[in-house]
Curated annotation (Swiss-Prot):
Biological pathway: Amino-acid biosynthesis; L-leucine biosynthesis; L-leucine from 3-methyl-2-oxobutanoate: step 3/4
Origin superkingdom: Bacteria
Residues the entry annotates as binding NAD(+): 78-91, 285-297
Protein name per the record: 3-isopropylmalate dehydrogenase
Species the sequence originates in: Buchnera aphidicola subsp. Diuraphis noxia
Record note on quaternary structure: Homodimer.
Family per similarity comment: Belongs to the isocitrate and isopropylmalate dehydrogenases family. LeuB type 1 subfamily.
């Protein structure tokens, strides 16, 4: 008997509902041509949830996510809700509590530049002519974003603010094991990012990563300081495979890697907990300026679905087929507006149709 999977679908705001429709096309192909038993159920989140329920993360949505095997998210936010108090705005009032509720300790941000699209990168052609494939593994629950004490003080004419960078050994061990396992499934290379020449937390980070590495003798481990890796990624991104980062450094590096691909509309992301339950979403925003114009790139949403199938369902072969369908579509010259050199481009729904068609052929 085949396992039945349940996905909580959160289309959200902006272009989210549009690109989610294209992910549905891929799901339908998986049902009809690959005999996968996948059920989906939609729930409101973000701005649309505020409009419909008066709250960005309704209890019904949270319960729906709890009863699923994974969460597939579109996008959240828009100008319509920017006048709300900051803690009530869609992004902060929905994503942060959702991540906290499920204890997502790891963020995966792949940055792939396909050689067919190397003209999009701001880097020189001789650097990116073969494309690149980097996976940033970012620790999500520790570090300076959550460390205490933190605050701001004014004493007479003196004003200052302070934050605390703190990492517990178990947090580093947990994220390091995951990064090594991912490196083992790729090119067996892992680069750990720190600032161990200055920060005590980074000294511990490096010591613990070295300790964990003894369990993965087949993975080549290297260490770089955050300032150096920022330069090295620009100089030669192909030298890297998996990057292991703390919360702050991963925030910086993942955005740099995204920028040098030339189109964030191509990039998926995943947030995972210890049970491999995950939240999968495009790395870009809700893009309200192009909402409803049928020109958004659905590839990031489709690749987010691929990551869901890979990490939460453990169906690597199926995920590879989705990835290959995207690659083959690009090789054939099909492009959406954001990645096209000219006016000859596909609409959002057309790109979804083409990718679904290529996937059918790879049965």
């Amino acid at each position: 008997m085949h396992k039945q999977y349940h996905i909580a679908v959160l289309p959200g705001d902006g272009i989210g509902p549009e690109v989610m429709q294209e992910a549905y096309k891929i799901l339908q192909v998986l049902r009809e041509h690959f005999s996968l038993f996948i059920k989906t159920k939609e729930f409101d989140i973000g701005g649309i949830a505020i409009d419909n329920h008066g709250i960005a993360l309704p209890k019904k949505t949270l319960i729906g996510c709890e009863n699923s095997d994974a969460i597939l998210l579109g996008s959240i936010g828009g100008k319509k809700w920017d006048t709300l108090p900051i803690n009530e705005r869609p992004e902060r009032a929905s994503l942060l509590p959702l991540r906290k509720h499920f204890n997502f300790f790891c963020n995966l941000r792949p940055s792939n530049l396909y050689k067919e699209l190397n003209f999009l990168s701001p880097l020189r052609n001789d650097i990116v002519k073969h494309g690149f494939d980097i996976l940033c593994v970012r620790e999500l629950t520790g570090g300076i974003y959550f460390g205490k004490p933190r605050g701001r003080v004014t004493k007479k004419k003196l004003m200052y603010a302070f934050d605390t960078e703190i990492y517990y050994k178990f947090e580093i061990v947990r994220i390091a094991h995951l990064a090594f396992k991912l490196a083992r499934s790729r090119k067996h290379k892992l680069c750990s990012i720190d600032k161990a020449n200055v920060l005590e937390s980074s000294i511990l980070w490096r010591e613990v990563v070295e300790e964990v590495s003894k369990e993965y003798p087949d993975v080549i481990l290297s260490h770089l300081y955050i300032d150096n890796v920022c330069m090295q990624i620009i100089k030669d991104p192909n030298q890297f495979d998996v990057l292991l980062c703390s919360n702050l450094f991963g925030d910086i590096i993942s955005d740099e890697c995204a920028m040098i691909t030339g189109s964030i509309g191509m990039l998926p992301s995943a947030s995972l907990n210890e049970k491999n339950f995950g939240l999968y979403e495009p790395a870009g925003g809700s893009a309200p300026d192009i909402q409803g114009k049928n020109i958004a790139n659905p590839i990031a949403q489709i690749l987010s679905l691929s990551m869901l199938i890979r990490y939460s369902m453990n169906l690597n072969k199926i995920a590879n087929k989705i990835d290959n369908a995207v690659i083959n579509v690009l090789k054939k010259g099909y492009k959406t507006m954001d990645i096209s050199k000219d006016q000859n481009y596909l609409k959002t729904n057309e790109m979804g149709d083409v990718i679904a068609d290529f996937l059918k052929r790879d049965k």
